Amino acid sequence: MTKAPVAPVVLVILDGWGYCEETRGNAIAAAKTPVMESLWTAYPHTLIHTSGKAVGLPEGQMGNSEVGHLNIGAGRVVPQELVRISDAVEDGSILSNSALVKICQEVRNRNGKLHLVGLCSEGGVHSHITHLFGLLDLAKEQRISEVCIHAITDGRDTAPTDGINAISALEDYINHVGIGRIVTVSGRYYAMDRDRRWDRVQRAYDVMTQDGVGDGRKAVDVLQASYAEGVNDEFIVPVRIAPGTVEPGDGVIFFNFRPDRSRQLTQAFVSPEFTGFARQQIKPLSFVTFTQYDSDLSVSVAFEPQNLTNILGEVIANQGLNQFRTAETEKYAHVTYFFNGGLEEPFAGEDRELVSSPMVATYDKAPAMSATAVTDTAIAAIQKGIYSLIVINYANPDMVGHTGQIEPTIKAIETVDRCLGRLLEGVSKAGGTTIITADHGNAEYMLDEAGNSWTAHTTNPVPLILVEGEKVKIPGYGTNVELRSDGKLADIAPTILDILQLPQPPEMTGRSLLQPAEYEVELSRTPIPVGLN
């Protein structure tokens, strides 16, 4: 007997598509988006919060893709690593952190150097410079004789030239605490690649590991010289400015807390079977990462991962239902690893498909990215008729928005809008329901108040639109579904469970965005478990 095809819930995450009524510097407002505009007019919609305490960050802190997908998938507000580590610095408990104290002892016993590696930024997305200050306090208390700082500059989650302020603050703190020196400087474009562009990573790695006394400049001089040549923080070419090579017997603390852009450089240091580029592994080398970048890495972890249970993917799997995730390279980890609460392995019945991002230096050169291929992949999954939940991420608004180039970002937005129209046709034919939303803002605010380019995320809310399939009514809510106006990302998973008529576990503390209504239900839809993959 042939089983009826499943009418799926399709969650579409428009990465970096925020909401802002101001039109100046707003690539979304400037773009032609007939699909999104018609959906906003015709279907239930609301705005939801994606920053600050609504996603487990400090008040006023902008959200990001990792935090956004983690909250969406968990169905609860997840306290973020930024808060956990900042609290440890503020209350002094970082000074007694067992992994950090141990590496200091090992370095001291071997008479080695302690290397502090990470993004020197106040962005709070991958790191925070106050965490580096806490490590300098630790090194002083542990009587480390030589502390070498390998500064990575931001310019992506901060203004393009904010790095000089961060580096100046770091120099001031070094003078205050009386320990440490900046020995290398590298833009995150090189040191924090996540797309296996190993030639970039190698340039940062070589500067850190090859012998040399440096050119004697101060770090702020390096930045000023780069700015004069039109090269901003993100793209600072790796350079050594003082002695302090990573050598056998040394220790490294990588103080980024976000894993995705920290894995590759870490692999270059510690993976015995590393093949990204030719290098001689440094042994012995003590290595601590602030958080768990990858469970397969041979490192110590200062702040162990939080254990999240009964997240959305797990609930779907435990019900015997199938699910599908797809995104292009830039956001694939977000719809898989982060969406699943930091778990690498898929749940039972969870299929995934990676679409390769175009190999370009920056995405303003290819604003369409791989959105068409992502759409094709999603439609093919819908047509299989076996998935109860399909999760899709369109990377364009965020990745092109980060370049600060408005015209290419407009093209990126328009590409996504066209793809969305085609995707919705596929969902409609399958009788499915689509939730369209975003993980954080970006492309809606690309100029600051002074008219300068803004390349970071925003604290703006994001849209959420609920699109029911034709002749398919959400059980219990009837034809005139309304959405709450005070929602947050943690409410999306309960909303999906509500639509699928699945029980919400107690660990999932978000609330469905669907407003109860007193209507006659014309046609209910119950998901049908299908054991085909």
UniProtKB/Swiss-Prot annotation:
Top-level lineage group: Bacteria
Residues binding substrate: H126, R156, D157, R188, R194, R258, P259, D260, R261, K331
GO terms of molecular function: manganese ion binding; phosphoglycerate mutase activity
GO CC terms of this entry: cytosol
Binding-site list for Mn(2+) 1: D398, H402, H457
Keywords: Glycolysis, Isomerase, Manganese, Metal-binding
Keyword RNA-binding recorded: no
Pathway info: Carbohydrate degradation; glycolysis; pyruvate from D-glyceraldehyde 3-phosphate: step 3/5
Catalytic EC class: isomerase
Cofactor comment: Binds 2 manganese ions per subunit.
Reactions performed catalytically: (2R)-2-phosphoglycerate = (2R)-3-phosphoglycerate
CDD domains, per the entry: iPGM
Residues annotated as binding Mn(2+) 2: D15, S65, D439, H440
HAMAP family the UniProt entry points to: GpmI
Similarity comment: family membership: Belongs to the BPG-independent phosphoglycerate mutase family.
Assembly information from the UniProt record: Monomer.
NCBIfam families per UniProt: pgm_bpd_ind (TIGR01307)
Protein task: Catalyzes the interconversion of 2-phosphoglycerate and 3-phosphoglycerate.
Protein name: 2,3-bisphosphoglycerate-independent phosphoglycerate mutase
Organism of provenance: Nostoc sp. (strain PCC 7120 / SAG 25.82 / UTEX 2576)
Taxonomic lineage of the native organism: Bacteria, Bacillati, Cyanobacteriota, Cyanophyceae, Nostocales
Gene (UniProt): gpmI
